[in-house]
Design a protein with these regions (language model features):
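Extracellular/luminal ectodomains of secreted and membrane glycoproteins with large N-terminal domains
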Residues: 117-118, 256, 287, 292, ...
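Disordered propeptide/prodomain
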Residues: 3-115, 140, 168, 270-271, ...
Length: 454
């Protein structure tokens, strides 16, 4: 009898032990929080109506809350008068419609709802069109239906608002919800739900919002919430993301947590970024034109510029742009009727060779093919025939910001955005029709005469 009792006790004890063991969570994070990588396609060429240089210039100034010059506003108003209110119009482009900006898929909520969003290193806010958005602002966009997400949680007394330089604005309320890029899943991500949307976004039906990849010091929530950059180091094996944007192609990608060595040639060279203003800011040391001339140009004080995947054009410091066009691009001129630099559409300006530096005096070089610069055919009455708005512009004297290096600057290179070490890396990559980019060399080696830009 005693033996039976002891055996029964052992059975009960064993069953209880199994129950205790199975109730203890397995060591390590749950699958949704496991560190993952993601490769997200970057689609271009879908914003068929927005190929207007002055409109892109206006849009960039507005984004950075830079006052809009009256001359530029007149040009944009003239353009918009020809465009139906529910679209952005169709303007002939050279060489084809595309390269306005790259949108990529993201999944939000539970169950997941897929939206195509603009991945933007010039903003810290991740916001979406949703069922909170006023009806008049939704013009064909896919919206995020918060009522269908079981994981959406409203953050009490939290709102967001962005005022643009043209005095338009976007605003709304803030939630936490599950946010996924491929296999990369972030729980409790800050999702800004739009109530009001600026017309510059509501007119783009293919894009359902933005993914902000700048630093949280510039996030526009009140009170301040974590931005995507704050979440990434906790969910990535390596706190980096890379960009491979392609000229007139939808084969580009954003990769998170790893470097795909098949996407570039030679070595990645890094320069430190200044994140004190919340942006990916670097310093432009100088430039040269790849045209056989002996001249290179260097700033007396390196110019602070911002790397921005969310801006279409390449805005270099004013002195550099003027010197490049006046000394190296025949028939280029600044047109007040277009409010920008214009060039013959059938021309191929010389490649723009650039140098970036940082506080530790690291210097890296790269070049933008001149064939990227004929951006949009001028179609206004009185515009010179055969001329195009150039993809290389300056911000002028309207701001202390000296440059915004947008997609035209970024497309020829492969970039690594290193969150942990606060640096950005560049490597050459094959550009059509070439199959290889070749080895990096000193691009200014034959420039024997230096001009100092003040």
């Amino acid at each position: 009898m005693a033996g039976r009792k002891n055996f029964g006790f052992m059975v009960v004890w064993f069953v209880l032990l199994i129950g205790i063991v199975t109730a203890i969570p397995a060591s390590g994070p749950s699958p949704k929080n496991t560190r993952q990588t993601a490769s997200i396609p970057a689609a271009d060429g879908i914003f068929k109506g927005r190929h207007n240089g002055a409109l892109e210039y206006h849009r960039t100034l507005s984004k950075y809350n830079i006052p809009i010059p009256s001359g530029l506003q007149r040009v944009v108003n003239r353009y918009l008068e020809k465009v139906p209110s529910d679209q952005t119009g169709t303007v002939p482009a050279v060489p084809q419609d595309g390269d306005l900006e790259w949108i990529s898929p993201a999944n939000i909520g539970t169950p997941a709802q897929q939206l195509y969003l603009d991945f933007d290193t010039g903003s810290a806010d991740t916001w979406v069109f949703s069922n909170d958005t006023v009806t008049k602002s939704v013009k064909g966009q896919t919206i995020f239906d918060l009522s269908k997400s079981t994981t959406a949680q409203l953050i009490p007394n939290c709102s967001w608002s962005i005022l643009y330089g043209d005095f338009s604005s976007s605003s709304g309320i803030v939630y936490k919800d599950t946010f996924a890029l491929g296999d990369l899943v972030i729980e409790g991500m800050t999702i800004e739900s739009a109530k009001q949307v600026s017309t510059q976004f509501s007119s783009q039906k293919e894009m359902s919002g933005l993914v902000g990849l700048a630093f949280s010091s510039i996030i526009q929530t009140e009170p301040v919430q974590k931005s995507l950059i704050d979440f990434l180091p906790d969910v990535l094996p390596d706190p980096i993301f890379t960009t491979d944007l392609r000229h007139n192609s939808s084969e580009g990608s954003y990769n998170f947590g790893y470097i795909d060595h098949d996407l570039y040639d030679d070595e990645i060279e890094y320069v430190g970024v200044d994140v004190s203003d919340g942006f990916w800011s670097v310093k432009m040391k100088g430039f040269a034109a790849k045209d056989g001339s002996d001249f290179s140009y260097e700033f007396e004080q390196p110019a602070q510029v911002i790397l921005d995947t969310g801006s279409t054009l390449f805005y270099a410091p004013d002195q550099a742009v003027s010197a490049y066009y006046k000394n190296h691009v025949p028939y280029a001129n600044f047109s007040y009727s277009e409010y920008g630099w214009i060039i013959p559409c059938n021309s191929t300006p010389p490649n723009f060779i650039w140098e970036l530096t940082d506080k530790d005096d690291n210097v890296i070089q790269g070049e933008v093919p001149g064939e990227y610069f004929p951006y949009a055919v001028l179609d206004n009455k009185g515009s010179p025939e055969g001329y195009c708005y150039s993809g290389l512009q300056s911000l002028g004297d309207f701001t202390s910001l000296q440059g915004i290096l947008g997609d035209i600057f970024l497309k020829p290179m492969f970039e690594v955005w290193d969150i942990g070490q606060q640096r950005v890396g560049f490597a050459p990559k094959p550009l059509p029709p070439m199959k290889t980019a070749g080895k990096r060399r000193d691009l200014m080696a034959n420039k024997t005469k230096k001009v100092i830009l003040q």
